[in-house]
Amino acid sequence: MQRLLLYVHFNKFNFISGHVLYQLEKIRPLYSRVVFISNSQLSEDVKDNLSSQNLVDDILERQNIGFDFAAWRDGMKAVGFDQLANFDSVTLMNDTCFGPLWDLKLIYQQFENDGEVDFWGMTNYRKDKDFNEHIQSYYLSFKKQVLTSSTFHEFWQGVQDFTNVQDVIDNYETKVTTNFLDAGFRYKTVFDTIHEDTTGMLYPDFSYYNPTAILNHKIPFIKVKTIANNEGIMPYIFDELERVSNYPLDLILNHMSMIDRPDYPYLLSRKYLKNQELAGEFGKKVAVHLHVFYVDLLEEFLDAFKAFHFVYDLWITTDVEEKKQDIEKILSNRAQDATVVMTGNIGRDVLPMLLLKEQLSEYDYVGHFHTKKSKEADFWAGESWRKELIEMLVNPADQILANMEANPKVGITIADIPTFFRYNRIVVAWNEALISPEMNKLWERMGATKSIDFKNLNTFVMSYGTFVWFKYDALKSLFDLNLTAADIPAEPLPQNSILHAIERLLIYIAWDQKYDFRISQNPHVLTPFIDNKQLNNREDLQPHTFVDFNQIGGIKGALKYIVIGPARAVKYIFKRLLIRK
């Protein structure tokens, strides 16, 4: 069979997702010619890869004018309307779906052998007060008898470049089916939804509102928008997909994390590291940066580093000459190679790492750690925190690098939440809101390309204590800020500082650089009832009033508030009591 595929691609960030490449690879054998029509700009490397891998035969780049229908029209023009009759079928498809979840070959054979079918698709939409019955346009296939008809040519040559997507829906998507039905042609779909039960659905759009039905009827494609629209059940859909299909779920996770925020709950459920081992000799360049403020903890880390089964360079920073000498003595006694750099007592562990920009930029992977203690809280805060971070990010370093190497889209690995922050109610939305302005400032300073207002987020997925593994490119924009001691408050460090902002920004910086993240699971398993008890408090249902004394008088304003606030409260109480009398 001579089949033509006209495949439309669009990505608002002007890159091509892995799920598109996978899709083309899997469906390519079905078609004798594939025309790839991109409504967004492609790099030369991407175009070369598409051609060299024989994923497509032709590449057509165009402005995103007229959306998919105008793109398909232009694809037909590129092939030649008079040449379409040389094909047994023409299939129209776009990249708005993940798949194929199952092999398409049997579906093609079924419809090609069905004499009662002139054109077909995956799913349809029943007639309602707004639209006529129609095949949903993410997948349409026309047989030769339709291709050679005047109806086909008149419809597609008449497609206009609408700038409003609703005009495209009203004039083309919902009418392409009725146009051919009125001409006497017949259609079928893989999943005929016309008489299906729609209980609980906002609209009878099964491709969007009912992913369970899509899987049950073995539709080989699931729409991207369906994933985001059904967050509450998506973890179960993912489980079912793993059970019934061989489709790589990482393709869904990576794409959804790139086109929207990477920290939605349904995505977090799938971001734990996989059980993966380093294969053979690991050839990438690895740097380990350890900031040593407490020299008495150095050997604890050196012992932990013995778990590494890869070659690495150790960079140690500290604040004063005396400590530098003590560190070098310990290293000498242990015959441990390392470069020790004195960076001063500003910026805690973060600025010392950033000051090594020139050195660390030469490495593929960087692990960042520090001798964590907590002077502001109980001994066990810092003690438990440090030990658990070592268990999550130092001990399993082989597994971490194996995961990051296996998935090129993963650029950073953080630790799971340390138990101290589950037993103790510290990181809560009202406190986090106070840090978001500083995060927004840094985001703007870095020239981030993705739009996000951190004030709109309740909490953040962060690397507690800034322990982290990363690909240098993932955090390059942070290093390129070239922060200095002048940017960092002096000790004692105030709350909501630039360092607290950086701690919370790391995975989002990587996201802006088109990298996803993974989480190393805490081996200390706690019942989620602890979180339920700590976080679900009735007081949180009441509005909170915050007073920022930095904006209303500083210390004098705070003292005035102590006097005036209670006085006004007492006055209010007396007034209410008098009214009751």
Regions found by a protein language model. Name each.
Residues 1-581:
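ER/Golgi luminal nucleotide-sugar-dependent glycosyltransferases, focusing on the catalytic module
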